[in-house]
A protein has these predicted regions:
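Alpha-helical bundle regulatory/interaction domains
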Residues: 1-182, 192-197, 211-216, 220-231, ...
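Extracellularly exposed regions in secreted/surface proteins, prominently low-complexity, repeat-rich
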Residues: 235-239, 246
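DNA major-groove recognition helix of helix-turn-helix
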Residues: 189, 201, 240-241, 252
Length: 256
């Protein structure tokens, strides 16, 4: 199936880098009567995408859509031929760039016109394929770029610490590391990210679990869970299964 589906990533312009993590594209041309399940683990990021060949509920067939932070595994089944070109925002980046409230977008896909101005969405709607995606997105989003606020820069600092230091297992440890109070941290995540700091930290550590298993970890799953902050094995198994689709033991055996 790999020869029929192509996933690529590209950098955005330096002007947009404070808000946009990267661009990504998916192209497919599947044989008749076949389908491909595209699965994505939850990340604390919103996406702005132009989609051709995919039908989304609730967007009135508008190809330019915004998908908020998804709190469970995100599955899309593709058939026939089509493509997607998208901007993946940094955690909090969409809200910081547009003024949208991230919590309102959590676990939903909406027409981009509900978040962006008509000039931006019209420019993206004219995109005819993935080849010109980078330039089109750069040009469309550049008009929104301003100077990042101090609050947003503080949020990015916190997110960077969560990502870089695998030993951070509790929100209190993050607060101490970054010198941020509990109320301030909760307010930043509520406003910009749309989910709690605890949820984001837990997702990052679960991504670390998957990374270790993909690298061939052969030790005890209880030890691996405890390493990343889960001391209740049943809780760890439920969270892993909800996100990955199979229990951690089955995933570990499959990766060996």
């Amino acid at each position: 199936m790999a020869q029929h589906v192509t996933l690529e990533r590209a950098e955005c312009s330096a002007q947009l880098a404070p808000w946009v993590e990267n661009y990504w594209s998916l192209r497919w041309d599947l044989p008749p009567d076949t389908s491909y399940l595209s699965s994505t683990l939850p990340h604390p990021a919103c996406n702005l995408s132009v989609e051709r060949g995919i039908r989304r509920d609730g967007v009135d067939d508008d190809p330019v859509v915004v998908t908020g932070v998804v709190t469970r595994r995100f599955d899309v089944t593709i058939r026939g031929a089509g493509w997607v070109y998208a901007a993946k925002f940094r955690p909090g980046g969409l809200a910081a760039l547009t003024g949208a409230h991230a919590r309102d977008l959590r676990d939903v896909t909406v027409a981009a016109t509900t978040v962006f101005d008509p000039a931006t969405t019209d420019a993206l709607r004219d995109l005819a394929g993935t080849d010109g995606g980078r330039e089109t997105f750069d040009d469309a989003l550049a008009r929104l770029a301003t100077t990042p606020t101090d609050d947003y820069l503080l949020l990015l600092e916190v997110i960077a610490a969560m990502l870089a230091d695998r030993s951070l297992l509790r929100v209190a440890e993050v607060e101490q590391r970054c010198g941020v109070g509990t109320r301030t941290l909760q307010r930043l995540f509520e406003r910009y990210v749309g989910v709690t700091p605890k949820w984001v930290l837990s997702r990052y550590r679960m991504h670390d679990v998957v990374t270790d298993l993909d690298a061939g970890y052969g030790g005890s799953l209880a030890d691996l869970a405890a390493k990343y902050g889960w001391f209740d094995q049943a809780h760890f198994t439920r969270e892993f299964t909800d996100l990955i689709g199979v229990p951690p033991g089955s995933y570990q055996r499959r990766e060996r």
